[in-house]
Amino acid sequence: MRVLVCAFALLFAWPAQAAPLRIVSLDYCADQFVLALADRSQIAALSRGSQRDDSYFRARAAGIRQTRGTLEEVLALRPDLVVRSWGGPWDAEAVYGRFGVPVLQVGGAPDFDGARATLLSAAVRLGHPERGAALARDLDQRLARLAALPAPRDPAAMYLSAGGATAGRGTMMDSTISAAGGRNLRTEESWAVLPLERLVERPPALVALGFFDHGRTRMNAWLPGRHPAVRRALDRARTVTLPPAAISCEAWFAIDAAEAIAAALRAP
């Protein structure tokens, strides 16, 4: 019910305008919103990252034109809406506004409430509020199922990327661990590089691994996550490898990662 109320409120709050017919997406996080919510016929171009293996909806991107995202190339596509998370110029709204092209900013949610709100508003702007409402409803149902699970015996958990980054408060990863029933051991704000000795000396009950087997990180032996001492610590700890596509953008589909963490926390 809450999802439907929010969707209708957004629908009537947004200025009346036709659904965009020539959408250009500037980065692979924006691609996910466009691929999930827009008709294929509405998409003029996606970013060159739309078919990366950490692009959540990469299968839907097959056959759709790609753009490098330069101003000249995008304008040549005659878009009536540009969608971005981080791609293009930092002041994209002002830059494209000079040419009469509106910009929709998406992604970057710090938690699932923010992800839901961004999803619903993007769906309205792309002309398909019912699709956003359906995805938000699925998200809420899955969050409710996680909340109903018995508490894990030891909820202590930590996220670690192959680059040595770990997530603290105010991040989607922190929200993901919490939704899974875990207790994030990093209580500081935002992201930081984890001191390796902390992991080696006091490994948590569960380490959620990100991008350890992804693309170039698979081949880079110099990354902090490849350090022999770290590998030994991880061998002693319980680990779960998170699907790269679920955590590459701060969006609603991070629920996949939450479910993976929840299962690992409660595994015998």
Predicted ranges, named:
Residues R2-P15:
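Bacterial N-terminal signal peptides
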Residues A19-R22, L81, D91-A165, R183-E189, ...:
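Extracytoplasmic substrate-binding proteins
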Residues D27, W86-G87, E189, G210-H214:
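Short secondary-structure boundary segments
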Residues D39, R60, R98-V101, A180, ...:
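Short, structured coil segments at secondary-structure junctions
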Residues R78-V82, R202-A208:
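Alpha-to-beta junction loops
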